[in-house]
Amino acid sequence: MTDRDRAAVYAAEDQWSAALDRGGPMDFFGSHLILPVQLRFGDLAAMQAYIDARCAERGETGAVRVRPRRGQAMAHYADGVIAIPMEAGWACRESILLHEFAHHVARGDGPLHGTVFRGSMLEVVAQAQGAESALVLRTCYEANGVGHVA
């Protein structure tokens, strides 16, 4: 199955992540939003605690394990394991963990970054960071041509 939306999803999430790096008040198409500042993690234990909290919110205690990954190329999710390149500062951010956790929530239905994944991503973002953050992400998806979600 092809993953034709991958580049657009990554571009949208990069825009959203940059907004989270700043956080705080934001004028958003005439509305006043307050975005959270995204968390940055210093070690694997903090990442695991964060993912454990996301799992607990969904009633899935211990469902996902976080482990280090060699290199700096990319984070990855497969079979209940999130692999994070710890040497890469970009990978130790909340937006990356939420992206990989959304793969778990999507359960592999459809293309890796298709409508089911994007719907799952919006769901976990709303739960972890609030409706404002999810709204900004949804708008970034729209701006990058991948606004349709399942």
Predicted regions and their residues:
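Walker B catalytic acidic pair
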Residues: 100
